[in-house]
Amino acid sequence: IAHINVVFVKEHNFILNKIFALQETSGITGLEHINSKSLVKLRDKSGTFIGTRMGRPEKAKLRKMKGTPVVLFPVGREGGRLRSFQDAISKNTIVSDFPTYECNECNIATIYSSCELCGKKTTWKKVCVKCKRTTLEDKCCGTYTRGFRRQRIDINHYFDSAIKALNIPAPQLVKGVRGTTNKDKIVEHISKGILRAVHKLAVNKDGTIRYDMTEMGLTHFKPKEIGTAINKLKELGYEKDIFGELLENDEQLLEILPQDVIMPSCPETPDETADDIFMRTCNFIDDLLEKHYHLPKYYNVKTKEDLIGHLIIGLAPHTSAGIIGRIIGFSKTLGCFAHPYWHAAQRRNFDGDETCALLVLDAFLNFSRKYLPDRRGSRSMDAPLVLTTVLVPSEVDTEVHGMDITDKYPLDFYRAAEQCKYPWDVKVLQVKDVLGKKEQYEGFKYTHETNDLNAGVRLSAYKFIPTMIEKLDGQLDLAARIRASDLDGVAAL
């Protein structure tokens, strides 16, 4: 192999050192070098870059427990693989843990707190774990009694009595649970499960119907973005736009009220949209009121526009305090748009957090603390044990108190950012500056215009790629294409 030695004269060394970076530089950037020569000071246009990645995909769907039960009623092993009442009925009886009640009017034992024959309130009897006798006392034979016992019950009797009381044909499939997990093995009335099956709804562990959604913040909206008529918005209190002009067209910009919520109704989603689920939930509750409780209907919903103005409860998974919200419209996204206050009242923010919504009347009629699993955390978390009806900004999570509410940032802000100073070194109007004043509820400003909140990607590829392996392959392929991404770093994560 031939080697060629190239010799350069000394005066060319400077150029070669620059080209091949053979010498260490002085440590100044190109911009600093230009400014050292220029009479006009140039600013850094690019600023500071930060890298981000998707934490979790968007979500808006009905919550379903394992097996998709429609009622918190145990069918035991007799319910088969599907845990269905139809399979259990074919076996006539089922064996599981049930509470023991007695009807003094009919002189019969039952598993309900009200008699399925006469409708009168029954007496709850406790069971001694030693002598097996029923008693009203908390103690017997020197030990504590418990509120249930292992029983073989005639499932046909309870199912047929429910169908007769409701006066409707039996659904083809009604699914229960293998066994209840609450302390006293309290069960839901089968009538509720039959009506949920009719309306194709699923029950949650506390007896309610939940719709899970990704949380998204919003302070302003246009009527065209949420599909609500001008007259309806006026009825809800939106009479003027942010400039003080009377509301007349769907292009005007409105400031959302702190407890108003825009629900998701994405046409591209493979899951059922919020309007579909809540319409069916309203119809279920109306049937429950009329056929089970013998009361007049309340919602009378026929279209999604009929849902506008109705109240919901927002509840984060790790809390036990719900906040009242009011439906004012539907977006075409897969997220729950609401005021930052409303999310903060649930101790949540917008970094991929998830909340759920349930109808107020659903919680009032069907929620019971006695249904909750007897496990640490399950006894109190993700359950509407407390309900906040009026949102007070000073009482919500303090993270939102640091939210900027100005329409522009001063020059000092950009100079401070250039010098990497702390955010609190520059005075910018924030929520904490208006707490306790009228301005804490209205008059918020923003810095960037948005033509339509429904624009952009409404359904990411992550949602419809079928398998996890294909999702990972897609993520790595994207990382390989993006020059700013480190493929090895993405793979390591």
Where are the regions a protein language model picked out?
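Conserved core architecture of multi-subunit DNA-directed RNA polymerases
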Residues: 1-493
